[in-house]
């Protein structure tokens, strides 16, 4: 069964959250817990692209986020959920062929799903300034 891109982004978010909480964790083990056995290779390929891409470009992505934070704010003050959602969106905007508007919309939807009511507005504001 093929997953939607939104579902793949949700799994990427959950994987990155788990890896951030436990650096010794293995992304493949997390995938096995989150994915059905009958997912196709293109799903796994895009999931790997997102997770590995965010991890590989994390320092550059974090520098982008920092540019749009208020004075006296740093990346460490951000809610972990919002930070991971921003990292996924910025990876898609900067390093993949996903249209910026789609990446922003998907990030806002993830924030609505996984964070509080104010977070989606914050995520949207940061990403709108970036694009």
From Swiss-Prot:
List the Gene Ontology MF annotations in alphabetical order: RNA binding
Which keywords fit this entry according to its UniProt record? RNA-binding, Transcription, Transcription antitermination, Transcription regulation
Under which name does UniProt file this protein? Transcription antitermination protein NusB
Under the heading HAMAP family, the entry gives: NusB
What is the native source organism of this protein?
Ligilactobacillus salivarius (strain UCC118) (Lactobacillus salivarius)
Reported function: Involved in transcription antitermination. Required for transcription of ribosomal RNA (rRNA) genes. Binds specifically to the boxA antiterminator sequence of the ribosomal RNA (rrn) operons.
- InterPro entries per UniProt: NusB-like_sf, NusB_fam, NusB_RsmB_TIM44
The cellular component terms of Gene Ontology attached to this UniProt record, alphabetical and capped at eight, are:
cytosol
Q: Give GO terms for biological process.
A: DNA-templated transcription termination; transcription antitermination
What gene name is given for the protein in this entry? nusB
Query: Belongs to which family?
Result: Belongs to the NusB family.
């Amino acid at each position: 069964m093929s997953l939607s891109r939104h579902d793949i982004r949700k799994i990427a978010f959950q994987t990155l959250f788990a890896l951030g909480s436990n650096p010794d964790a293995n992304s493949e083990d997390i995938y096995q817990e989150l994915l059905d056995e009958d997912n196709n290779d293109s799903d796994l390929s895009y999931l790997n692209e997102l997770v590995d891409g965010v991890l590989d470009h994390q320092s550059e992505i974090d520098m982008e986020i920092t540019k749009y934070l208020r004075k006296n704010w740093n990346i460490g003050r951000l809610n972990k959920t919002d930070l991971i959602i921003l990292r996924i969106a910025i990876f898609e905007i900067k390093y993949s062929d996903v249209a910026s508007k789609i990446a922003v919309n998907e990030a806002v939807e993830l924030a609505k799903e996984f964070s509080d009511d104010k977070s989606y507005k914050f995520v949207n504001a940061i990403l709108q300034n970036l694009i």
